[in-house]
Regions:
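An anion/pyrophosphate-binding glycine-rich loop and adjacent beta-alpha core
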Residues: 1-85
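A conserved FAD-binding loop/helix module that cradles the flavin
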Residues: 116, 157-193
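A short, polar/proline- and glycine-enriched secondary-structure boundary/capping micro-motif
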Residues: 27-31, 149-150, 194
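A glycine-rich dinucleotide-binding beta-alpha-beta segment and adjacent secondary-structure elements
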Residues: 85-162, 166
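Predominant activation on well-ordered alpha-helical scaffold segments within soluble catalytic domains
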Residues: 39-43, 72-76, 87, 91, ...
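Short, ordered coil/turn segments that flank beta-strands lining enzyme active or ligand-binding pockets
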Residues: 12-13, 133, 140, 177
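Generic secondary-structure signature for well-ordered alpha-helical cores
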Residues: 15, 22, 77-84, 88-95, ...
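Hydrophobic "anchor" residues
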Residues: 16-17, 137, 181
Length: 195
């Protein structure tokens, strides 16, 4: 939420490297491509106050994940990046559209700054067995296996083959809709096999 509201991600060179509003799956790929596979989520007091409404953020803050810096020089020291590069990056965060990434900012970030060191991680897998429209598991030749159904995380999902296809809730969507379809398919299989 902090990135969507104006926070930025900074790498070890003191630079932004993508549009932070794309989503966490996309961000993970960009972060892992940075030196050391890490970045810093940087935000200001207004965003720190906003974050207090999120229990997971408050828990991370209580565990010491949130670091504080009085100004850009102190923030550069914390991140371990060149102060002049970081200052130029922060100066470029102004209301309007960033020409490098296409991201739109509502306002500039103001010192003091706060930062959390982040990296990308595998949250969960997406997809599974190939199925047809009735949730029947398919062989390699595309024909259905008799009486074998799959839904939810056991079946291929709707997210596609790239990070941009994932939306929060896709797993639940596949489980509910696929389970519903599988139940109807199973019911029909039972009817068809009844004497």
């Amino acid at each position: 939420a902090l990135m969507m509201e104006g926070g930025v991600q900074i790498n070890a060179q003191g630079q932004r490297f993508h549009d932070e509003t794309q989503g966490y799956s996309e961000a993970a790929v960009h972060v892992l491509a940075q030196p050391g596979g890490v970045a810093w989520n940087v935000f200001d007091d207004a965003l720190l106050a906003f974050a207090q409404d999120f229990p997971d953020f408050v828990a991370a803050q209580g565990a010491g994940a949130v670091q504080h810096a009085a100004d850009a020089v102190a923030l550069a020291q914390l991140i371990g990046c060149p102060p002049d590069a970081l200052q130029a990056t922060l100066n470029a965060v102004q209301p309007g559209t960033d020409p490098a990434t296409g991201r739109t900012f509502k306002r500039a970030l103001q010192a003091p700054f706060h930062a959390i060191k982040v990296t990308g991680a595998l949250f969960h897998t997406q997809g599974g067995l190939d199925i047809d429209a009735q949730t029947r598991v398919l062989r390699q030749d595309g024909t259905p296996l008799p009486n074998v159904l799959a839904a939810g995380g056991a079946a291929r999902g709707v997210s596609g083959q790239a990070v941009w296809g994932y939306l929060s809730g896709n797993g639940l969507l596949s489980a509910i809709a696929g389970g519903h379809i599988a139940a109807h398919t199973a019911q029909q299989l039972l009817k068809d096999s009844a004497p």
